[in-house]
């Protein structure tokens, strides 16, 4: 466990799950932001693996060992046993390593890293990497012969694991697949699965605040991909909007959806809105033909380029706008808060309090209680 001031501690648990007072094991070899410890007992030693140096370019893996669980721990003379020392290499920010031994007796280090594109941006956030561990004559583990992370490596001689493809979701089940995430817990009635649709309740708060809820996201896993969703034509009051979002956090995101204009008789517009720190950029929109039952929203991604298109039949797509450099969706995009999760993409609905403040020419009031209905979401790399 990482203590309050970056001090690695181990909590000793009794069988009745009562926690004793913490005991300091080791301050870390680098003495800066030691975290994520893993203990391994091997050949009479307790090996303490740590991530150190923070989540930026100085991220690294170190190891120390002791004959006794509570120390004293001796730092490895080869530390850091994993770090990227070349800023020009594609794989950076290596840390949080865990040693594993295969059934064949081979040792590997599973660790986190970031792959950069463009001018050093890692839009996929922290990814999982694998490199071999070898043990020195004096009993120390070193990773990839201390050469740093490998961009190309021989995979372990193990049975292949076939994972179920959940790239497309027609929302036919009574539950969401594990691909879907919420940045914050939605309202109790915020997400509903009914009649092969996912219904997202319009949030009172917009995406630019941590109070925003009912945002349904999945991780961006590829540098190049296309995402399409089928949205039932919404009935919106002025100021309300719903659709797709390319989302990092409340500071940086893109909205691509149907917006109701702030008019007594609102028009529906298809808009692309960028949020970059304190700046909001609204691009020229397209009038929506709401005589259609559905509208298809499509986002094509090529590294840091995004192209936004729409269709009424899922065949003939019309481009709304292309953005050439969405750097702000990357971990390094802006300096505001902790950023290491990578970009996400998904769906949202925003109600605000526009509906309840709206009155038409006949004195009828609007409502903030609406749901955006999505028939499917498809992700293809």
Short names for language-model regions:
Residues 1-381:
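Carbohydrate-active catalytic/glycan-binding domains of CAZyme proteins
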């Amino acid at each position: 466990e990482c203590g309050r001031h970056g001090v690695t501690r181990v909590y000793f648990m009794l069988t009745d799950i009562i926690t004793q007072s913490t005991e300091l094991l080791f301050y870390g070899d680098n003495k800066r932001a030691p975290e994520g410890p893993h203990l391994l007992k091997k050949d009479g030693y307790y090996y303490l693996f740590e991530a150190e140096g923070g989540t930026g370019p100085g991220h690294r893996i170190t190891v120390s060992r002791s004959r006794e669980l509570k120390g004293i721990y001796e730092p490895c003379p080869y530390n850091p046993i994993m770090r990227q020392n070349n800023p020009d290499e594609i794989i950076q920010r290596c840390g949080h390593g865990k040693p594993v031994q295969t059934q064949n007796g081979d040792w590997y280090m599973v660790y986190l890293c970031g792959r950069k594109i463009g001018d050093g941006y890692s839009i996929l956030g922290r990814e999982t990497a694998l490199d071999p561990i070898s043990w020195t004559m004096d009993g120390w583990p070193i990773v990839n012969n201390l050469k740093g992370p490998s961009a190309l490596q021989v995979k372990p001689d193990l049975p292949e694991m076939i994972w179920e493809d959940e790239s497309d979701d027609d929302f036919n089940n009574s539950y969401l697949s594990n691909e879907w995430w919420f940045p914050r817990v939605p309202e109790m009635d915020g997400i509903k699965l009914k009649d092969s649709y996912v219904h997202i309740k319009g949030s009172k708060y917009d995406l630019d605040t941590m109070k925003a809820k009912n945002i349904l996201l999945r991780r961006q896993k590829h540098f190049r991909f296309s995402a399409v969703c089928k949205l039932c034509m919404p009935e919106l009051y002025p100021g309300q909007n719903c659709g797709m979002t390319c989302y990092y956090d409340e500071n940086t995101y893109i909205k691509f959806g149907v917006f109701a204009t702030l008019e007594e008789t609102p028009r529906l517009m298809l808009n692309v809105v960028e949020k970059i720190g304190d700046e909001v950029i609204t691009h020229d929109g397209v009038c929506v033909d709401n005589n259609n039952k559905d509208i298809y929203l499509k986002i094509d991604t090529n590294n840091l380029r995004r192209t936004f298109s729409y269709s009424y039949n899922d065949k003939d797509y019309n481009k709304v706008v292309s953005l050439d450099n969405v750097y702000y969706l990357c971990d390094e995009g802006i300096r505001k808060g902790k950023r290491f999760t990578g970009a996400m993409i998904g769906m949202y609905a925003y109600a605000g309090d526009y509906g309840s403040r709206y009155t038409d020419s006949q004195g009828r009031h609007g409502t903030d209680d609406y749901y955006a209905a999505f028939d499917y979401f498809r992700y293809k790399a």
